[in-house]
Amino acid sequence: FNRKRPHVVLPSINTLPSETNKTPAYPSGHACQSVIIARYVAGKEPKAERELMKAAYECGYGRVIAGFHYVSDFDAGNLLGEKMYVLMNKMDFGAELAEDPARGIRIKYKDLSETLKQLV
């Protein structure tokens, strides 16, 4: 879990300055969060599911192209996002989402992340 990012290992990969240099590459948080948000919105707008998931995957894979992640980070982030979405639904995150969807997802994502850290 403490793998260095591609652009840190290979300085020849040019990236923009980023705070992510201080955090491990695995798994991709962008991929994970994109999947969670896409699944939530797709639950409200089922006809848009294909496009939403495509956008989520493009967001996550863009981080591979940019040199911030390996493909395995992207894959793990997607899988983690799918699993976290299921768990978040079991935690009943509807109340916060109804009021402010973006804030509600951040709150429950943080709650679940903290819970998972305690288990590991």
Regions found by a protein language model. Give the residues of each.
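Membrane-embedded catalytic cores of phosphoryl/pyrophosphoryl-handling enzymes
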Residues: 3, 7-120
